[in-house]
UniProtKB/Swiss-Prot annotation:
Locations listed in the record: Cytoplasm
Designated name of the protein: Glutamine--fructose-6-phosphate aminotransferase [isomerizing]
GO-annotated biological processes: carbohydrate metabolic process; fructose 6-phosphate metabolic process; protein N-linked glycosylation; UDP-N-acetylglucosamine metabolic process
UniProt keywords, alphabetically: Aminotransferase, Cytoplasm, Glutamine amidotransferase, Repeat, Transferase
Description of how the protein assembles with itself and partners: Homodimer.
Signal peptide stretch: none
Catalyses which reaction(s): D-fructose 6-phosphate + L-glutamine = D-glucosamine 6-phosphate + L-glutamate
Presence of keyword DNA-binding: no
Span of domain Glutamine amidotransferase type-2: 2-225
Molecular-function GO terms, alphabetical: carbohydrate derivative binding; glutamine-fructose-6-phosphate transaminase (isomerizing) activity
Superkingdom assignment: Bacteria
Protein's job: Catalyzes the first step in hexosamine metabolism, converting fructose-6P into glucosamine-6P using glutamine as a nitrogen source.
Length: 631
């Protein structure tokens, strides 16, 4: 949610700021703005709506400043209007601030500053920050404006409560950009005589792959000569940048109409990368190996003597966690519960001993998930060893906040995902649960070596099977999608390990097509949802081979008896399904335990093509953000 970009260097700042904000559009926003320092003054331009509106306004401005900050805003405090857009300035137009996050005590600060005579012109929490900094500055020595600004920001951040990342300009400091982070992501980029800041590395990769992630409670001063990092008490902190393994092409469409479609087609490569990274190619059951077939690199103490696993996640990551529950229980034999992170904090279950807590978030910055993990850690810290916090993160961003607060992480290696609707990162998260379940199963001897090898063989076949779906079904699914462009409601059904896939299919459709869609366990249809069915409500049923196949077919026939149009996700060789379903989303024949990854692919394609047919913004659906960094 929201996006920050900052620049100081030798190039025209406006161009870099706009380009960076365009790279952050996928995070979701409803207004945008920039501020630069020119001849001792702050120049600020803001606009409601898309960046196109801001760019139109900038066409009438000649601005060659080499220092600036930019922001895309997702409304939290105050409506999405121009006067609420960032940057916000103090009353003297000296200080400009952009901010991500929420200042929880903004009303108290606002009231205090109003009593001092300051005026407020927006409804946002952010506006208190530049006014607070300016208020502190007036009482500091003015002989060195650069040092005074740093000191004022150091004092100001101690008064701010909540999660925030800020970037600050001072009209009196044309060679300095100061940023601060507390519970909201902020990345610094290093170039040749130029430096950048952004809320996500996607804004930086076209300019540099040398980056540094600020941690909570840190301030950074960027000048044309370099970067200095301090803690909130203004003590210097020594930090070293790292090099990203991403290239500029990873944030381009490369010939695809939308990023989402590109990312769907990247899934075979993502699965191959995960398999090559984590599965031991040489492992054979016949060799009676003494080592795990999976290279996760986890501390053995993390999974030793486990009695319970709890998964905390939101949205699509929660669906991946539900698949993980089946795998961890069926393969590793460990009771597993899956919680919405946003609910866990307010109704946490009783503490159980020898419990592994897994936080799943593709960005590593999902506020609800991080807060739930932190709460779980804190309530276990002072307890005896049996209850000590054992926390694992599953994320696509190993440099994220999540990685700093857990014992270990599993990197899903999916690469940058620009489309708001998760596709390849979901598949990568599910794979992470396969690897974890197999690793624990080997350690606990809950599966025979032969059974483990059988699953590994199936996993290695997945990339080619996904390619088969994309190559053989892509055009057919696109044609089918055209028939549902005016549909108002969908029902998705699944059982067992594919019930979460029904939920995921429904979520994908509603996210990007704005069609009301719900996922249900197939056996629950008769307990309420069947009342919704008629000829106008298509039903998508996931009927994969295995223990629940016949039950799903039976449930589908109940829907057909109510005139619903039936769409089946089913193997190419399933003659029974062909006789029941009106339309088929065909997939290769796979083992039931491996079916979620192949079953989800046609549902992604169906959702994409319906949304595209409706002429919608597939990559940036309304009201949604890629990374939800506020609670």
């Amino acid at each position: 949610m929201c996006g920050i970009v900052g620049y100081i260097g030798t190039q025209t700042a406006v161009n870099i700021l706009i380009e960076g904000l365009e790279r952050l559009e996928y995070r979701g926003y409803d207004s945008a703005g920039i501020a630069t320092v020119t001849e001792g003054k702050i120049e600020s331009v803001r606009a409601k709506g898309k960046l196109f509106n801001l760019k139109e306004k900038l066409e009438n401005h000649s601005n060659f400043s080499r220092l600036g900050i930019g922001h895309t805003r997702w409304a939290t405090h105050g409506k999405p209007e121009e006067h609420n857009a960032h940057p916000h300035l103090d009353n003297q137009q000296r200080i400009a601030v952009v901010q991500n996050g929420i200042i929880e005590n903004y009303q108290t600060l606002r009231d205090q500053l109003k009593e001092k005579g300051y005026q407020f012109y927006s409804e946002t929490d952010t506006e208190v920050i530049p006014i607070l900094i300016a208020d502190i500055l007036k009482d500091l020595p003015s002989d060195d404006p650069d040092e005074a600004l740093l000191e004022a920001i150091g004092k100001a951040v101690h008064q701010l409560e909540g999660a925030f990342a800020i970037a600050v300009l001072d009209a009196h400091c044309p060679e300095q950009l100061i940023v601060a982070r507390q519970q909201a992501p902020l990345i610094l980029g290093f170039g040749q005589g130029e430096f950048f800041c952004a809320s996500d590395v996607t804004a930086l990769v076209h300019h540099t792959t040398t980056v540094l992630s600020l941690e909570n409670g840190e301030i950074a001063r960027l000048t044309p000569l370099g970067v200095e990092v301090y803690d909130f008490n203004l003590k210097r902190v020594r930090k070293l940048p790292r090099t990203l393994d991403w290239s500029a092409t990873t944030v381009e469409k490369q010939g695809f109409r939308h990023f989402m479609l590109k990312e769907i087609y990247e899934q075979p490569a993502v699965v191959r990368t995960c398999l090559a990274t984590y599965l031991n190619e040489q492992w054979r059951a016949a060799d009676h190996p003494s080592h795990s077939p999976v290279f996760l690199g986890l501390d053995p103490q993390l999974t030793k003597n486990l009695q319970h696993i709890q998964v905390l996640a939101c949205g699509t990551s929660w669906h991946a966690g539900l698949v993980g529950k089946y795998l961890l229980e069926q393969l590793a034999g460990i009771p597993t519960t899956v919680h919405y992170a946003s609910e866990f904090r307010y109704a946490a279950p009783p503490l159980t001993p020898h419990t592994l807590t897994i936080g799943v978030t593709q960005s590593g910055e999902t506020a609800d998930t991080l807060a739930a993990l932190e709460m779980e850690k804190q309530r276990r810290l002072t307890l005896e060893d049996d209850y000590k916090p054992l926390i694992l993160g599953i994320t696509n961003r190993p440099e994220s906040t999540l990685a700093t607060m857990v014992n270990e992480i599993i990197n899903t290696h999916a690469g940058i995902e620009i489309g708001v609707a998760a596709t390849k990162t979901f598949v990568a998260q599910v794979l992470a649960f396969y690897f974890l379940a197999l690793d624990i199963a080997f350690q606990r001897h809950s599966l025979s070596l032969e059974a483990i090898e059988h699953i590994m063989v199936g996993l290695r076949q997945l990339p080619a099977q996904i390619e088969t779906i994309l190559e053989q079904q892509g055009s057919a699914i696109e044609a089918l999608a055209h028939e549902f462009a005016e549909t108002q409601d969908f029902i998705f059904l699944g059982r067992g390990i594919n019930f979460p896939i029904a939920l995921e299919g429904a979520l994908k459709l509603k996210e990007i097509s704005y069609i009301h869609a719900e996922g249900y366990p197939a056996g629950e249809m008769k307990h309420g949802p069947i009342a919704l069915l008629d000829a106008k409500v298509p039903v998508v049923a996931i009927a994969m081979p295995g223990s629940v196949h016949d039950k799903v077919i039976s449930n589908a026939q109940e829907a057909k008896a109510r005139d619903a149009r039936l769409i089946g996700v089913t193997p190419m060789d399933d003659s029974q399904a062909r006789s029941v379903f009106d339309d088929l989303l065909l997939v290769p024949h796979v083992e039931e335990m491996l079916s979620p990854i192949v079953a989800v692919i046609p549902l992604q394609l169906l959702s994409y093509h319906i949304a595209a047919r409706r002429g919608l913004d597939v990559d940036q659906p309304r009201n949604l953000a890629k990374s939800v960094t506020v609670e």
